[in-house]
C-alpha cells in the first residue's frame, strides 16, 4: 500500500477500552517494527465523566491521563480535544491527586491546561495535536485561538477538518492558512 503511518482511536472509559488498548498497542508495535509512524486519537467516552452539570470529557487531568496511556502504547502523535477545564480526577473520584496539582501546576488558564496535556505526552516527546472542533459561526477566530494556545503550550498543531472542509473552498483555505501562519 505504501503507507507511512497508521492511526487509531481509543475511547478511554468506554466498555471496549481495554480491548482497544490491547489491539492498538499490538498494531502500533508492528507498525514501528515496519518503520511506520503511529497516530492515536485519545478520546474520553463515559457518562460518568459528567458530574453536577460539568462535563469533564475535556478536563486537563483526565485527557492528560489518556494522552499518557496513548504514548505508553507507542503513539508518536496524540490527537486530543483541547482542555477546557480541570479537576476531573477529584470530581469523579478517579485516581489519587493533590490540591496543589490544581493550584500550582495547572492553574485555570487555557495554555496551562493544554501544557498539562503536552506534559503527559512525555513532555512533548510524542507530539500533541488538538482537535479543531465542530464547524460553527466564528470558526476563523476559534481556529486561530486554538492554534495559539496549542503552540504556546508546546503542542505540534491542530486538525481542523470540519472547520475547514465544511465551508466554501475559499473560506476553508483562508482558515487553514491562518493556522499555518501561527505555526
Task: For the regions a language model picked out, list residue spans one by one.
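C-terminal helical cap(s) of enzyme catalytic domains, especially alpha/beta-barrels
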Residues: 153-154, 165-183
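Alpha/beta enzyme core
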Residues: 1-128, 137, 141-156, 181
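Glycine-rich beta-strand-to-loop/alpha-helix junction loops that act as flexible
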Residues: 129-134, 160-163
Amino acid at each position: 500500500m505504501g503507507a507511512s503511518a497508521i492511526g487509531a482511536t481509543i475511547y478511554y472509559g468506554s466498555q471496549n477500552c481495554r480491548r482497544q488498548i490491547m489491539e492498538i498497542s499490538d498494531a502500533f508495535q508492528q507498525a514501528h517494527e515496519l518503520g511506520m509512524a503511529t497516530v492515536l486519537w485519545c478520546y474520553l467516552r463515559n457518562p460518568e465523566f459528567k458530574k453536577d452539570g460539568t462535563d469533564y470529557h475535556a478536563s486537563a487531568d483526565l485527557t492528560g491521563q489518556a494522552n499518557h496511556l496513548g504514548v505508553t502504547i507507542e503513539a508518536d502523535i496524540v490527537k486530543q480535544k483541547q482542555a477546557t477545564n480541570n479537576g476531573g480526577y477529584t470530581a469523579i473520584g478517579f485516581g489519587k491527586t493533590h490540591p496543589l496539582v490544581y493550584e500550582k501546576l495547572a492553574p485555570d488558564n487555557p495554555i496551562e491546561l493544554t501544557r498539562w496535556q503536552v506534559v503527559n505526552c512525555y513532555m512533548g516527546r510524542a507530539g500533541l495535536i488538538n482537535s479543531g472542533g465542530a464547524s460553527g459561526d466564528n470558526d476563523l477566530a476559534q481556529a486561530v485561538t486554538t492554534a495559539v494556545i496549542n503552540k504556546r503550550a508546546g503542542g505540534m498543531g491542530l486538525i481542523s477538518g470540519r472547520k475547514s472542509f465544511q465551508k466554501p473552498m475559499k473560506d476553508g483555505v483562508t482558515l487553514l492558512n491562518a493556522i499555518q501562519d501561527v505555526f
